[in-house]
């Protein structure tokens, strides 16, 4: 009975979120409290303890540091430079848009932020070059998605955090997150390539010409921000990759065990503030609080579901009713009619 109530609560949280436009995570927190305390006899402190503190801290810390690159215009300036260098090869413009969006999202801007400032640029390029709006839109969307899935970017961090919370080792979580990133990098390239080289509109772009004025050079704050961002990405990725390649090396194993992307990002945020690379209030406001509340709120409700045995029942039902090859398809359909960040906690728990 309790399992049915928990499933009903998850469905109700989604439905109420869509209907009222209120963050689904807030409804999930309310249902977690009501079901946990009054339905299962848990104490309020036990329910509060289900808040995924580590995931919250990591996402907050990383997004806070990366927000400096958004606030001081580093990412927008970088996008202008990358696209400018493709002006003499118009047929490759969709790939330039894709890789530009990928790089910027991988540097921490996140999916929606990249869409917000890359979409107008891409629309202007489509008007000037005759590039299909469909191809341009696909390039921006795919690039933002791929970059956000990078291991040290927003969605990549969420993937890794949820997997480690589900009991997967840090190394395996890193490898799995790398596979997710690579799949969302390679498949879009094949799709965009087919549109560019196999369609009439794509072949017509080869003869088109568009003018682009040289963008201004990066200022002091933007250069330092770019350097710090690349340095943090290198530090965060070097340790786990080295440990995977040399698992028997004691020194590398020790260093890797002390690495935490959230704590490292916190140090870099302090450095950025000391160097006055951006306004603290604006950087704090750029943190995706809505996404954080949604993920953590749903995480609390999923923890209640695990406590009630709902996830075990759901996993057994899926294992006995759906062929393994169709499981990704089923969850893909669920994600298509829901929020990705809502579907993720459930999938990782199952």
Predicted features by range, described:
Residues 1-58, 66, 181-185, 189-313:
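Hydrophobic transmembrane alpha-helices of multi-pass small-molecule transporters
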Residues 28-32, 94-98, 115-119, 136-143, ...:
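Alpha-helical transmembrane segments of multi-pass membrane proteins, especially transporters
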Residues 62-67, 100-111, 141-151, 179-191, ...:
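Helix-loop-helix module between adjacent transmembrane segments
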Residues 74-93, 314:
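Membrane-embedded helical hairpins/re-entrant loop segments and their flanking transmembrane helices
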Residues 90-105, 129-146, 169-177, 325-337, ...:
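Alpha-helical transmembrane segments of multi-pass membrane proteins
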Residues 123-218:
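Membrane-core helix-loop-helix motifs of multi-pass transport proteins
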Residues 313-324:
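Membrane-interface interhelical connector segments
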Residues 341, 346-350:
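Single conserved hydrophobic/aromatic residue that forms the stacking wall/gate
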């Amino acid at each position: 009975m309790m399992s049915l109530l928990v499933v009903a609560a998850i469905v109700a949280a989604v439905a109420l979120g869509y209907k009222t436009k209120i963050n689904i995570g807030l409804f999930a927190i309310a249902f977690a409290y009501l079901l946990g305390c009054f339905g299962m006899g848990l104490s309020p402190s036990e329910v509060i303890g289900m808040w995924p503190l580590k995931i919250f801290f990591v996402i907050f810390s990383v997004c806070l540091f990366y927000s400096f690159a958004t606030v001081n215009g580093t990412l927008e300036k970088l996008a202008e430079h990358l696209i400018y260098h493709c002006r003499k090869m118009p047929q490759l413009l969709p790939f330039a848009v894709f890789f530009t969006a990928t790089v910027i999202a991988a540097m921490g801007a996140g999916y929606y932020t990249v869409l917000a400032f890359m979409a107008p640029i891409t629309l202007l390029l489509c008007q000037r070059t005759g590039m299909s709006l469909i191809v341009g839109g696909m390039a921006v969307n795919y690039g933002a998605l791929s970059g956000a899935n990078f291991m040290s970017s927003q969605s990549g961090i969420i993937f890794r955090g949820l997997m480690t919370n589900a009991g997967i080792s840090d190394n395996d979580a890193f490898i799995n997150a790398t596979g997710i990133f690579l799949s969302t990098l390679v498949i879009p390239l094949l799709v965009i390539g087919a549109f560019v080289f196999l369609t009439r509109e794509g072949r017509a772009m080869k003869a088109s010409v568009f003018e682009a004025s040289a963008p201004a050079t990066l200022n002091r704050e933007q250069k330092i921000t770019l350097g710090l961002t690349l340095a943090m990405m290198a530090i965060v990725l070097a340790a786990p990759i080295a440990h995977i390649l040399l698992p028997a090396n004691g020194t590398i194993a020790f260093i890797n065990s002390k690495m935490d992307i959230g704590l490292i990002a916190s140090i870099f945020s302090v450095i950025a503030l000391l160097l006055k690379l951006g306004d603290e209030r604006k950087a704090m406001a750029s943190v995706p609080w809505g996404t954080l509340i949604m993920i953590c709120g749903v995480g609390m409700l999923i923890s209640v579901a695990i406590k009630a045995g709902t996830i075990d029942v759901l996993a057994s039902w899926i294992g006995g009713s759906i062929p393994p090859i169709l499981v990704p398809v089923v969850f893909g359909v669920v994600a298509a009619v829901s929020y990705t960040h809502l579907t993720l906690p459930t999938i990782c728990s199952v």
